[in-house]
């Protein structure tokens, strides 16, 4: 009997190691798939046939995004007609991809800035505040993962975000310091310390529920969420299989409508917020005892675009002042201020647009020979003060630079957000998923 128990224990350990082995070591390539891209119109629609060529490169596929029901505190589909068996059934179809790609680990994401939240009554905070509320969330999460064949769950917990910070010169910094004496600092969350402790409890309790089945538990630190406020790093890392640092969207036309600037630099720029870069975020987690092998750097597959005005000048050199909020969105993104990589690529100089004028004329591309901050492209306003645009974006080269940074630092890998904004049709150069391929090539 004793021998039998030992053998059963050894078998359980092997199964657990097998399921979690994809998050140990390095060169993780965690790919995000936004299920809503399946519902887009025309060429913007990412079908499962379009998705499949990417899966050979991904170590993980994160399907997003599930939501929290504020009444029951249960994990639920954000679109039942799309996700569940009563409709299109993408949950089961996506996890079924593992039969053809057995190396692939498929996880379900909750939150991820895709779940509707009342700013005055944030359900993600309310759930944390009660152990009785956490229980139905944990039970329903475990059930959903098991029912639909996912390999685990990723927490894209929607904590309150930092207040946007403006770029200040020397005089501006003096005035800001003087004003702060009287107004004080902006408080992101008055109960941040309590919520940090409660989130630690949630991670521990959730991992305890998932561990017997060997399920993976990941964390996505969403853009502009202050890690020092909400994450007790030493207390949670042992219960997490990986941490995706979404170190991008530091500057966006929604957060900073009057100032266009690099959204996702690797390193700090002069006279900018020292925290608004990849390296700062990585170093914070490393210094707080998160193993390097668990850290994955988030890389977006899109650009952020502002309208330039006559007062924005002619050079395009960031930060660009006197911007006028978000530029028009693309046919693919359908979101103001957001352009997918193929949408950006089509605006850069090419034979098809070299003779076009006005809003269709090509942008001027400015590369980054330092490999520290990123590319941008712009078109100053015309004589009528119209058609000005400034966009900073990720392309295969900048993504490869970040992958090289990850290798140099000995980190776990990269999280690409998301596949539907990479050039999945090969419209730009003929190569499908060029950003994904560039990252994978750098890891080889």
Curated annotation (Swiss-Prot):
Its main location: secreted. It comes from the Eukaryota. Cooperates with insulin-like peptides to stimulate the proliferation, polarization and motility of imaginal disk cells. May act by stabilizing the binding of insulin-like peptides to its receptor through a simultaneous interaction with both molecules to form a multiprotein signaling complex. CDD domains: GH18_IDGF (cd02873). This is Chitinase-like protein Idgf4. It comes from Glossina morsitans morsitans. It holds the Pfam family Glyco_hydro_18. InterPro entries: Chitinase_II/V-like_cat (IPR011583), Chitinase_insertion_sf (IPR029070), Glyco_hydro18_cat (IPR001223), Glycoside_hydrolase_SF (IPR017853), Glycosyl_Hydrlase_18 (IPR050314), IDGF (IPR015520). Residues 27-444 form the GH18 domain. Belongs to the glycosyl hydrolase 18 family. IDGF subfamily.
């Amino acid at each position: 009997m004793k021998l039998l128990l030992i053998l059963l224990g050894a078998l359980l350990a092997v199964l657990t190691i097998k399921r979690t082995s994809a998050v140990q070591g390095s060169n993780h390539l965690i790919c995000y798939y936004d299920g809503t891209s399946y519902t887009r119109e025309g060429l913007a629609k990412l079908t499962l046939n379009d998705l499949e060529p990417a899966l050979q490169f991904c170590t993980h596929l994160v399907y997003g995004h599930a939501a929290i029901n504020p009444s029951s505190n249960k994990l639920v589909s954000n679109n039942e007609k799309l996700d569940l068996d009563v409709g299109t059934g993408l949950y089961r179809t996506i996890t079924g991809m593992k039969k053809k790609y057995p190396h692939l680990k498929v996880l379900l994401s909750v939150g991820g800035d895709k779940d509707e939240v009342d700013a005055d009554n944030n359900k993600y905070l309310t759930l944390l505040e009660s152990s009785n509320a956490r229980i139905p969330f944990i039970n329903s999460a475990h059930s959903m993962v098991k029912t639909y064949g996912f390999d685990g769950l990723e927490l894209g917990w929607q904590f309150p975000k930092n207040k946007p910070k403006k770029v200040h010169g020397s005089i501006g910094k003096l005035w800001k310091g003087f004003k702060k004496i009287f107004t004080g600092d902006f408080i992101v969350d008055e109960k941040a310390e309590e919520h940090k402790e409660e989130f630690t409890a949630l991670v521990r309790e959730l991992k305890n529920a998932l561990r017997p089945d060997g399920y993976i538990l990941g964390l996505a630190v969403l853009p502009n969420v202050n890690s020092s406020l909400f994450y007790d790093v030493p207390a949670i890392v042992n219960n997490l299989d990986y941490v995706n640092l979404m170190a991008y969207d530091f500057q966006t036309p929604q957060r900073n409508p009057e100032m266009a600037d690099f959204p996702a630099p690797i390193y700090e720029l002069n006279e900018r917020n020292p925290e608004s870069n990849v390296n700062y975020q990585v170093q914070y987690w490393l210094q707080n005892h998160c193993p390097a092998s668990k850290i994955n750097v988030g890389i977006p597959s899109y650009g952020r675009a502002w309208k330039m005005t006559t007062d924005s000048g002619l050079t395009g050199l960031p930060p660009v002042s006197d911007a006028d909020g978000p530029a028009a969105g693309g046919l693919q993104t359908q979101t103001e201020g957001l352009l997918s990589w193929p949408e950006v690529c089509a605006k850069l100089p090419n034979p098809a647009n070299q003779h076009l004028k006005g809003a269709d004329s090509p942008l001027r591309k400015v590369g980054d020979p330092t490999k520290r901050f990123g590319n941008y492209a712009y078109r100053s306003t015309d004589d009528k003060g119209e058609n000005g645009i400034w966009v900073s974006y990720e392309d295969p080269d900048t993504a490869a630079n970040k992958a090289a940074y990850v290798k140099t630092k000995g980190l776990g890998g990269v999280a690409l957000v998301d596949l539907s904004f990479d050039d999945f049709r090969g419209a730009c150069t003929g190569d499908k998923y060029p950003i994904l391929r560039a990252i994978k090539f750098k890891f080889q």
